[in-house]
A protein has these predicted regions:
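Intrinsically disordered, low-complexity, mixed-charge
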Residues: 1-94
Length: 94
């Protein structure tokens, strides 16, 4: 059953290649969605796929790429998408 999760990562996660690495990992896993930086210094992802795929992305996001220092990771499993998402992309910062 396809689900949509919002994942917000805190810590040193901007300026370290986090979004690009997240796109690569999400595509490797087979998810759709997007990732972006937020003004508050966090990285937000909306990911759509099977629960086991989403769990795999969450596990990766808790570690991130080599230079990231993740302090916490919030997951909203009740996030509702307006429609199915195609592909996985890096979006502009908000």
């Amino acid at each position: 059953m396809t689900a949509t999760w919002q994942i917000v990562v805190h810590g040193l996660v901007q300026g370290v290649g986090y979004r690009a690495a997240c796109v690569d990992e999400a595509r490797r896993i087979g998810l759709t969605g997007w990732v972006r930086n937020r003004r508050d210094g966090t990285v937000e992802a909306i990911a759509q796929g099977e629960p086991d795929q989403l769990l795999a992305l969450c596990e990766w996001m808790r570690e991130g790429p080599q230079h990231a220092q993740v302090s916490s990771c919030e997951v909203d499993k009740a996030w509702v998408a307006d429609s199915p998402i195609k592909g996985f992309e890096q979006r502009a910062s908000i």
